[in-house]
C-alpha cells in the first residue's frame, strides 16, 4: 500500500473530519452563489441595420442601471432577479447610428420605483433624439413617459401611463397600457410581456421568454403600428456565463429590412 492509502486507513477519524469540513465548505460556497447580490449593471450594444434597399448601417449603445438596494438573486432566473425583487433603480442609455445620409444620436434617463411596503409602482423616463444631416437643420425630439402600476400578485405588474413627444414640427401625448408576468409553467420559468399606446396611430407589442435554466433564455417578440407596414418579428436569446457576465442577441425581421443586435453586460 502507498503512504496515502496507509494514511487513509490508519487515520479514519481524521479523514472523516476532513470530509465533513469539505462538505460544509462546499455547501457554504453554494449558498454564497445562490445569495449573490449586485447593485449595478453596465452594458454595451452593437447593432447592424440591413435594409432591403440601401446600405448596411452600424449603431452602438451604452446603458447602465443603479439599484438603490442590492438585488438578491435567490433562486430566480438571473435576468428577472431585479423585477422579482421589486428593485427600484435609476437607469440611462445613450446610442448612436450612422445611416450615411443622416445620423441619429439618442439618450434617455429613467426611474423605476417600487413603493416600499405596498404593491404600487412608479416609472418615469425622459430623453432626446437628434437627427443630423448635411444641408438641413438638425431635428431634436424630446420623448417622455410616466406610468403608475400595481402588482396584484408576485411576479405580475400592470401599469398605465402617458407617452409623449415634442419637436419643431409638433407634439402629442398618448395613453399607454403595459403588463409583465414572470411565473413558472411546468418545470420552467417564463416571462410574458405586452404593451400598447393609443392615439391617432395605435402601437402594440408582445413578447415571451422561456428560461431553459436560471441562466439561459430564448424568446420571441412582435410589434406593430396601426395603419403602417411597421410590423417587426423578433427572435432573442440571453445567456449568463457567470452571475456577473451576460451576453444577449436579437434579430428583428421588419417589412423593410432586418436588425441584428448583440449586447454584453456586467453586474457588480
Task: List each model region and its residues.
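Outer-membrane beta-barrel proteins
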Residues: 4-26, 30-268
Amino acid at each position: 500500500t502507498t503512504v496515502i492509502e496507509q494514511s487513509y486507513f490508519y487515520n479514519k477519524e481524521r479523514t472523516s473530519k476532513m470530509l465533513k469540513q469539505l462538505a460544509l465548505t462546499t455547501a457554504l460556497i453554494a449558498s454564497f452563489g445562490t445569495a449573490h447580490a449586485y447593485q449595478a449593471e453596465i452594458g454595451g450594444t452593437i447593432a447592424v441595420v440591413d435594409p432591403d434597399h440601401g446600405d448596411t448601417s452600424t449603431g452602438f449603445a451604452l446603458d447602465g442601471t443603479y439599484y438603490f438596494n442590492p438585488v438578491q438573486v435567490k433562486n430566480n432566473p438571473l435576468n428577472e432577479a431585479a423585477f422579482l425583487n421589486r428593485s427600484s433603480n435609476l437607469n440611462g442609455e445613450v446610442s448612436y447610428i450612422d445611416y450615411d445620409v443622416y445620423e441619429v444620436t439618442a439618450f434617455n434617463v429613467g426611474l423605476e420605483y417600487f413603493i416600499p411596503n405596498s404593491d404600487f409602482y412608479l416609472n418615469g423616463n425622459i430623453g432626446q433624439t437628434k437627427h443630423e444631416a448635411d444641408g438641413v437643420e438638425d431635428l431634436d425630439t424630446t420623448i417622455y413617459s410616466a406610468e403608475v402600476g400595481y402588482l396584484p400578485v408576485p411576479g405580475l405588474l400592470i401599469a398605465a401611463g402617458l407617452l409623449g413627444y415634442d419637436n419643431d414640427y409638433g407634439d402629442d401625448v398618448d395613453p399607454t397600457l403595459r403588463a409583465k408576468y414572470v411565473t413558472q409553467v411546468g418545470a420552467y420559468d417564463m416571462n410574458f410581456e405586452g404593451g400598447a399606446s393609443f392615439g391617432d396611430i395605435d402601437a402594440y407589442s408582445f413578447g415571451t421568454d422561456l428560461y431553459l435554466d436560471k441562466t439561459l433564455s430564448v424568446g420571441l417578440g412582435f410589434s406593430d403600428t396601426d395603419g403602417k407596414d411597421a410590423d417587426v418579428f423578433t427572435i432573442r436569446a440571453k445567456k449568463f456565463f457567470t452571475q456577473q457576465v451576460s451576453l444577449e442577441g436579437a434579430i428583428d425581421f421588419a417589412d423593410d429590412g432586418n436588425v441584428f443586435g448583440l449586447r454584453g453586460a456586467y453586474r457588480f
